[in-house]
Amino acid sequence: MAAKGGGGGGGGVGTLKSTSINGVKLYSVTGKNYVAPWVLAKKKRSLRKDAEYQRRLELIHDLRFETATTRIKVTPDGQYVIASGIYPPQMKVFELKELSMKFERHMISEIIDFEVLGDDYSKLAFLCADRSVCLHAKYGSHYSVRIPRMGRDLAYDCWSCDLLCAASSSDLYRINLEQGRFLASLSSQSPAINVVTRSMIHGLVACGGEDGAVECFDMRRKSSVGRINTASSSEDVDQEVTSLQFDENQGYLLAVGSSVGKVRFIICYVLII
């Protein structure tokens, strides 16, 4: 099971209410601030200003996998949570309004990463451990294609309909979902690409390499517009870039996570024209 915490105002993290009987703790799954589905919408709107209600903690039932959960993402419309896990390899979709599982699907191979291609769960792309990229629709598996090298990360450029696949190669593979075919790859100077991300503000694509470098691509020109080595000292020479994230306000700040556990921030507005 997973917890869904309320947003809003100032504060602390919600906790599950519990009582103890003969030394055995009993937890209230819904908590005292649970609002039944039949409560009037007007009443629910008034609760938005209730700080205690906003800090409530509710459980999403059945959000678990036999061995481990590998990825969790929320759909852009905020209505669904999609999770992948092992073993066996599978994905599950949960509806937040009902706090329960909507459906699950079993996969042939372990899911390395996945992307939500639309506003909800109706269009999904899965990068799997057997080098396959599996496209799913509401009714299930739609199409599958293999990339040349082992995939490591996935990103989607909604402006060009390009699905970007980072792999154990210097090439960033491009699958155009509108044309249904591979396009010319974006070539990086790194020997292999660990992670790829895209800014929702200006569309710049950033790749993190095994050599500790971050390289940015302009999807309009389909070429590199800048590259920087994130190693700040001789102690960081062997580090790899393992995580990237643009800020969601202006897109000028890029957070870079490394294999040695350090997080650095890069200002990249000079790359945006």
Question: Language-model segments: which ranges?
Answer:
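Blade/loop signatures of beta-propeller domains
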Residues: 30-56, 86
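A short helix->beta-strand "capping" segment at the edge of beta-propeller domains
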Residues: 45-67, 95-103
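Surface loop/turn motifs at the tips and blade-to-blade linkers of beta-strand repeat domains
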Residues: 62-66, 104-108, 144-149, 186-189, ...
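Canonical WD40 repeat/beta-propeller blade segments in eukaryotic WD-repeat proteins
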Residues: 68-73, 109-116, 149-157, 191-198, ...
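Structural hallmark of WD40 beta-propellers
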Residues: 79-82, 120-125, 143-144, 152-153, ...
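Conserved strand-to-loop turn within each blade of WD40 beta-propeller repeats
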Residues: 85-87, 127-130, 166-169, 208-211, ...
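WD40 beta-propeller blade core
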Residues: 92, 133-134, 173, 215, ...
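Short loop/turn segments that connect beta-strands within beta-propeller blades
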Residues: 96-99, 137-140, 177-180, 219-222, ...
